[in-house]
Amino acid sequence: LYSILKNTNHKVEVTWLRPSMFPTWKRQGWGTPFTCFRYAIPEMCGFKGKALYTDCDMINFRDMFHLWRTDLKGKPFGMVWDSLQMNNARHKDTPQERGWWCDSIMLIDCEKAKEHVHSIEEQAEWNGTYKWSFMESIGSPFREKSEHLVHEIDARWNSFDGCDTAYPYKTNNVDDITKEHFELEEIW
């Protein structure tokens, strides 16, 4: 949250999606305590307006307003295409072996999303992880099948490159490790 607020002059409204808000949800198999709550957002917003979801461990170096104002071209979702995502065995040795829409950051047109997400009640009772069912329902890992539903946002909004800091190690002694911080160049 700090990095979002630090890098904007715009009003930001934040709703933390805490497990206590969803006490009846089946959460077996989730990767995090909040994995599938993100799909409740359109209904939580009354299927009106836009919403922006980010995982809580995201660090932002740019004003999120630039992402917020992204034109979704009439589509319900904006996401990054993760071309490195390894898919399950049924896609091995096919063009879909890698690649998936990444929901770590999503821009959502809540009204248009209504027909593509199940109700909160249905999601709460979902057997398995709703995330994977949702992603397959919108076309992942078949990118071309989902072009009418997902606007691809700039991959830099979900970057894992780690280029902002260098850690030169001079010794094997942990007490002697030097960490150098370099000024960030203008991002984008």
Predicted features and spans:
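Short, surface-exposed amphipathic charged segments that create phosphate/polyanion-binding patches used
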Residues: 28-33, 91-95, 167-171
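GT-A fold catalytic core of metal-dependent nucleotide-sugar glycosyltransferases
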Residues: 37-85, 107-110, 115
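Short gly/pro-enriched beta-turn/loop segments at secondary-structure junctions
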Residues: 99-103, 146
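Class I SAM-dependent methyltransferase SAM-binding "motif I" and its flanking Rossmann-like core
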Residues: 76-92, 96-100
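Extracellular/periplasmic catalytic domains that process cell-envelope and extracellular macromolecules
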Residues: 71, 98-100, 172-173
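A glycosyltransferase accessory/donor-loop signature
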Residues: 8-10, 15-18, 108-188
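A short acidic, often aromatic-flanked loop/helix-cap motif at beta-alpha or helix-coil junctions
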Residues: 20-25, 85-86, 158-162
